[in-house]
Amino acid sequence: MVLVDTSVWVGFLREGDSLLSDLLNEGEVLTHPFIIGELRLGNISKRQHFLSLINDLPQATQATEDEVTHLIEKNKLYGKGIGYIDAHLLASSIMSVSPLWTLDKRLDAISKKCKPPIG
């Protein structure tokens, strides 16, 4: 399973993405309420149909505020150029034992070296 970030979904909606299509067909895509929320704010063709489909995808484990805070402190994520929603998604991907697929270069680099929020 892979947690697919908003940036990947935006590219998929604009231009398509065969890898994301394959992962969707194989049932290997996770989502998160924050990703769905960000997509809701976008201008999406066939909006209701798309949102209905993405809402039916399995959800990543949602990190608590304490878990995200611990992740930020443990990994010294402050001043690294990622946002709080990014930190939530990062914590959720770690807790779900699923990689985070993002086109955000900073978030991608951080996700590859982060330690779990607890433990």
Q: What positions do the PLM features span?
A:
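Short, well-structured N-terminal submotif of metal-dependent ribonuclease cores
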Residues: M1-T31, R40-S52, P117
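A generic structural signal for short hydrophobic patches within well-formed alpha-helices
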Residues: W9, I36-L39, L107-D108
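Structured helix-beta-strand junction loops
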Residues: E26-G27, L53-L57, S96, C114
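A general structural signal for well-ordered alpha-helical segments in protein cores
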Residues: H32, I36, R47-F50, E65-T69, ...
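Generic short alpha-helical segment signal, independent of protein family or function
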Residues: I44, N55, E73-K76
